[in-house]
């Protein structure tokens, strides 16, 4: 028997990384919000690797933080190791990665949800999204409780019809053998949504007391203090190392001998797996010529013996898992605490979503996270904050909020999903962004904090910090134009030590700083006019000066891009009536319903010639309207 259990503005179904950000965003924007989860103990669960960040992913975390989200702050508090990756490359691809104490991360995020004003958290299984006349009205739960809402965000992760697979054993389940969500999957289908099936997996967790670390290469954290959040204090934290080892020919031999027992090759697994995070058996088959593969052994936290074996994801039977793990140098006597497994799950085909992450067919129904076909905590959290923001704005009857490809990696992620779709678990990479130099992890606050403040998500404390920082950067950039470095013996001695050409006349500091080998602090001692500035200000000044020419070029590219994005296409256009479009273009445009010429140009099968036809048609329509007005 069903009963009415409460009224809310926004309801979030699921409390993983997408659900947490969605719930916090909606509540912080003033909406009465409810987060429903299968298990209160699994809020912000990290069922796979105990880490946050890495290439492109760190950019997402920084952008979430800049908008007023929580992931960066919580990671900084739960981190047990921090490393800046890609420092040998340009700043566009610098990437911060944190090893996190996964239990501490969960506890901190759970507390954030429980103490957030306007937010309730309840342990209930949602089985039905309630819809009336094409508009969402609430949700119904397994025990009969119904909650009304003007917007619902579905963030169910890998729980939709989840199936755990270990060897020839398979059973319904979510991550870490939790309950799956079965009926909700069928309910979404009944609402007219097209679902697909994906697969992912995770390696075994092993007992650190049974590992010989002397046979592995230590991977320590950086001595320099790093943070994901722009407002986290710059303080030293306790750090623990990770370890590097490799598979061997014996490892590969055991895997090859047991491929017939692999669900991946026996037909038990039907879902498509992630291209950029393949299982170890898939790697051995696809890269048969490689004699070894990297394996990273990572701590799951400070208060557990469990170690995560990155690079050894598998669904092979437990006896095979133990045999192959024991062929890894340093793991000859290893004990497995939790076996590796694969998980299959349903996902929503993301081309059914708008850029706001609202479904095209049902008003007020949003989806975010792995349910949209992505992989990764960071991708999920990024979608979560955007869906939460837009759900709140819809309730408040305000204009929707979205980010373009030229504004944020979040914009790249969402645009890829809703325009191109995905036929495998989607992972964001820096290579997917056209304007990488503009979308650096260091300047996410400059790009997004004002936007977050305008919609009511960024706090005054965060906003004041942002304003002070960027005012300092702007002032220092102007000030440096007035500082001149003398052409004397002391200066040239420093330049020579840096293998930089000497100067024969007094030179503006800003000109010297443009040289790749010159750092701000290197020359600071050559003048009496330097200030004691925060490191984040100095780093930003350096980047802006050194890459000024490249930045200007990308800004010009963005201007051209935005012209195409500004040419709006109504979703009710009858493409059959537009002469000159190819058959494939008509089919794709009808299916995906792009909202701009820019979006249309990124759909596979829509050629430059088709775009020209659309531009001509738009101009003809504009003239018709103008003529009618006259």
UniProtKB/Swiss-Prot annotation:
Keyword Flavoprotein (UniProt): yes
Output the GO biological process annotations, alphabetical, semicolon-separated: tRNA methylation; tRNA wobble uridine modification
Query: A single GO CC term, please?
Result: cytosol
- Does the keyword section mention tRNA processing? yes
Q: Which organism is it from?
A: Desulforamulus reducens (strain ATCC BAA-1160 / DSM 100696 / MI-1) (Desulfotomaculum reducens)
Tell me the superkingdom of the source. Answer: Bacteria
Amino-acid positions noted as binding FAD in the UniProt annotation, renumbered to this chain:
14-19, 126, 181, 370
Q: Which SUPFAM superfamilies match?
A: FAD/NAD(P)-binding domain
Q: Which GO terms describe its molecular function?
A: flavin adenine dinucleotide binding
Query: HAMAP family under this entry?
Result: MnmG_GidA
Q: Which function does this protein serve?
A: NAD-binding protein involved in the addition of a carboxymethylaminomethyl (cmnm) group at the wobble position (U34) of certain tRNAs, forming tRNA-cmnm(5)s(2)U34.
User: What is this protein's record name?
Assistant: tRNA uridine 5-carboxymethylaminomethyl modification enzyme MnmG
Q: What are the entry keywords?
A: Cytoplasm, FAD, Flavoprotein, NAD, tRNA processing
């Amino acid at each position: 028997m069903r009963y009415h259990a409460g009224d809310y503005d926004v309801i979030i179904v699921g409390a993983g990384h997408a659900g947490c950000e969605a719930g916090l965003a909606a509540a912080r924007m003033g909406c009465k919000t409810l987060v429903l989860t299968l298990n209160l103990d699994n809020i912000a669960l990290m069922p796979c690797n105990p880490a946050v960040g890495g290439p492109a992913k760190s950019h997402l975390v920084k952008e979430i933080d800049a908008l007023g989200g929580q992931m960066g702050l919580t990671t900084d508090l739960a981190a047990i190791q921090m490393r800046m990756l890609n420092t040998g490359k340009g700043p566009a691809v610098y990437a911060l990665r944190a090893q996190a104490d996964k239990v501490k991360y969960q506890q901190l995020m759970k507390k954030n949800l429980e103490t957030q004003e306007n937010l309730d958290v309840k342990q209930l299984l949602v089985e039905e999204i309630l819809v009336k006349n094409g508009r969402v009205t609430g949700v119904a739960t397994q025990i009969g409780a119904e909650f009304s809402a003007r917007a619902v965000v579905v963030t169910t992760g890998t729980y939709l019809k989840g199936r755990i697979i270990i060897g020839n054993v398979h059973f319904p389940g979510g991550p870490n053998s939790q309950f799956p969500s079965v009926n909700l999957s069928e309910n979404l289908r009944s609402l007219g949504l097209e679902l697909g099936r994906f697969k992912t997996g995770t390696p075994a967790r092993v007992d650190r007391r049974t590992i010989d670390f002397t046979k592995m290469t230590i991977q320590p954290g950086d001595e320099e203090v790093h943070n994901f959040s722009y407002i986290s204090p710059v303080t030293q934290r306790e750090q623990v190392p990770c370890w590097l080892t490799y598979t061997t020919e014996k490892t590969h031999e055991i895997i090859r001998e047991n491929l017939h027992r692999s669900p991946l090759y026996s037909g038990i697994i039907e879902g498509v797996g992630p291209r950029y995070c393949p299982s170890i058996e898939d790697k051995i088959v696809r890269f048969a010529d490689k004699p070894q593969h990297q394996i990273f052994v990572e701590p799951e936290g400070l208060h557990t013996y469990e170690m995560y074996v990155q690079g050894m994801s598998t669904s092979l039977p437990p006896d095979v898992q133990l045999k192959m793990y024991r062929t890894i140098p340093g793991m000859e006597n290893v004990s497995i605490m939790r076996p590796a497994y694969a998980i299959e799950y349903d996902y929503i085909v993301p081309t059914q979503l708008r850029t706001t992450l609202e479904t095209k067919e049902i008003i007020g129904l949003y989806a975010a996270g792995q349910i949209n076909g992505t992989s990764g905590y960071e991708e999920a959290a990024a979608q979560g904050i955007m869906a939460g923001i837009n759900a709140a704005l819809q309730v408040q009857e305000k204009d929707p909020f979205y980010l373009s490809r030229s504004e944020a990696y979040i914009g790249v992620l969402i645009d890829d999903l809703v325009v191109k779709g995905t036929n495998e678990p989607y992972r964001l990479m820096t290579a997917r962004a056209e304007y990488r130099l503009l979308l650096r992890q260091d300047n996410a606050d400059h790009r997004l904090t004002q936007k977050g403040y305008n919609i009511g998500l960024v706090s005054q404390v965060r906003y004041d910090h942002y304003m002070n920082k960027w005012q300092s950067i702007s002032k220092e950039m102007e000030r440096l134009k007035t500082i001149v470095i003398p052409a004397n013996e002391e200066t040239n001695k420093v330049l020579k030590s840096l293998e930089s050409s000497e100067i024969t006349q007094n030179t503006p500091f800003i000109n010297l700083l443009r040289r790749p080998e010159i750092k701000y602090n290197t020359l600071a001692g050559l003048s009496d006019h330097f200030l004691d500035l925060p490191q984040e200000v100095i780093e930003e000044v350096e980047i802006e000066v050194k890459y000024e020419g490249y930045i200007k070029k990308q800004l010009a590219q963005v201007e051209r891009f935005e012209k195409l994005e500004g040419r709006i296409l109504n979703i009710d256009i009858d493409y059959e009536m537009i002469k000159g479009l190819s058959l494939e273009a008509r089919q794709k445009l009808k299916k995906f319903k792009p909202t701009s010429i820019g979006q249309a140009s990124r759909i596979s099968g829509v050629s430059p010639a088709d775009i020209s036809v659309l531009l001509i048609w738009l101009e003809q329509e504009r003239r018709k309207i103008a003529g009618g007005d006259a």
